[in-house]
Amino acid sequence: MRVLVTGGAGFIGSHLADALIARGDHVVALDNFSTGSTANIKHITKNFEIIDGDIRNADLITDTIKDVDLIFHMAAALGVNTILESPLESISTNIAGSEVVLTAAANHKKRILIASTSEIYGKNPKQPLNETDDRVVGSPQKIRWSYSDAKAIEEAMAFSLNQEKGLKVTTARLFNTVGPRQSAHYGMVVPRFVRSALKNEPIGIYGDGTQSRVFCHVDDAIEALLALVGTDKTINEVYNVGGTGEITIKELAETVIKETKSQSSIEYIPYEKAYAPGFEDMQRRVPDISKIKQNLNWAPKKNLSQIIADVAAHISNS
């Protein structure tokens, strides 16, 4: 099978390419390398082609989609730093780019999975979050929420194209996927903490550290994505994909220090200093993954210690 992976040189996209090739598929990866990296795909030597291009290029996307059997739409402008530093580019990529990809998939009757995000739920205080829960986001003047808004529009476009054109689409809402190749540059907390710990440098926690998350190893997330496109019963459905084991960011920092045998200290950085005045964060973000467990018998296998070990090994060998 020929499979298109948009964002194929990115963190999750490159791991997805590895898994698809391992099962015998030919992967066409499309990436503009704004956040993706050639280092993520340089090890791939067969059944793989890379297209350096932008998902907003309608002619390129149409020509590419015509010749594939399946699409994983992983491309996005993501990460808090990216969103705050380049909000217009983020909004354009996540809305205009996704419209191009989804429309082409509908016109050519291709099966597609879109990678959405737990950011969809915003700051909804109800936890754990299931797929039918409401979005609770801040004011549009707070740029921090623009990524959540853009991904919500992407999901709405996908459902609309299913209704009007029969698009065979499945939506995966990813919760804090972590693992080798994830960059600390875009504000991703685990590689940032691990990198500091390996250097015995202070680990900077934004806020007071009581905010909590649940992390999922990228290998587990990839297994979920492949399972989601392996059956027609997931078409026009949304599935949370995440790990288990809620942990505060302070506890995460302490665990990273312990697992890496680091001499790092912990320092607390006010949100206003890390980002901008008025920045808002979610106090808790915990996925309810009962739907994917019940429907596809999927559950994450790797715990936080394994995640930290794999991230540390990758950083040490890079």
Residue ranges and their predicted role:
Residues 16, 225-229, 253-256, 308-315:
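Hydrophobic "lid"/C-terminal helical patch
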Residues 125, 152, 168, 177-191, ...:
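Glycine/proline-rich active-site loop of Rossmann-fold NAD(P)-dependent oxidoreductases
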Residues 131-138, 166, 193-205, 259-273, ...:
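A short C-terminal helix-loop "cap" of Rossmann-like NAD(P)-dependent dehydrogenase/epimerase domains
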Residues 25, 291, 303-318:
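Amphipathic terminal alpha-helices
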Residues 208, 236-239, 250-253, 261-284:
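C-terminal "lid/loop" region of Rossmann-like NAD(P)-dependent oxidoreductases
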Residues 218, 272-299, 303:
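Conserved C-terminal active-site "lid" loop/helix of NAD(P)H-dependent oxidoreductases
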Residues 221, 225, 241, 252, ...:
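Non-catalytic, hydrophobic alpha-helical segments
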Residues 1-175:
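N-terminal Rossmann-like NAD(P)+-binding domain of SDR-like oxidoreductases, especially those catalyzing
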